[in-house]
């Protein structure tokens, strides 16, 4: 149970009712109307970042997302979620953040060289020292905090789609262990998704897990959020 929460944010009411399980349709089409239309992207790969950003948009505009239980395949809401997905990647440099943290060469914990500044800090140091304070500041100031979750170690850019995005809206800090409460687009209407990290981990560390899914998370970081006005339902 989170002891500090964003007032009024509850995933079952503040998140989308449908899951991050979109049909196999292109994200965009480019071309000449009536002559050629080329499909770009595939919604079935997931739009979690767009859903996380959009959920915060609706919340901060004092409204709830549409009550639809089926993911859209076209129309204003679909286009809006796709636009927010693009925003969540902070192009052109945003994907490099994922690739850096996915790289198997990056250590999980500190090494002799990283402790003296001669090598990059490991994943645990970055989560605890760099990312967690920013996430906590968001929540303490009443804002859900978008997180990028690293769920694969790989140098293959095509594995970017294996990662995930969520919204942290609460936390419990006990000793050196923090447990964050999350809105997970993969688990609509669930108020019980959490992610934990032992901030004291140093010598050894294993991937933390999201509950109740049990999915491994090798690292996380706060995603820079920019606000947009959600579409009208009219």
Question: PLM features: residue spans?
Answer:
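N-terminal low-complexity, Pro/Thr/Ser-rich intrinsically disordered segments
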Residues: 1-14
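Polar low-complexity intrinsically disordered regions
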Residues: 1-4, 70-73, 81, 232-234
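Cysteine-nucleophile protease catalytic domains, especially the papain-like/related folds used
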Residues: 11-129
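Structured loops at beta-to-helix junctions and adjacent beta-edge loops in soluble globular domains
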Residues: 21, 51, 150, 183-185
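Short loop/turn segments at secondary-structure transitions that flank enzyme active sites
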Residues: 24, 54-59, 153, 172-175, ...
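Sequence-level detector for tyrosine residue identity
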Residues: 58, 80, 98, 169-171, ...
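Active-site-adjacent substructure of cysteine-protease-like catalytic cores
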Residues: 124-182
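Cys-His-centered catalytic/binding microenvironment captured across papain-like cysteine peptidases
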Residues: 159-163, 172-234
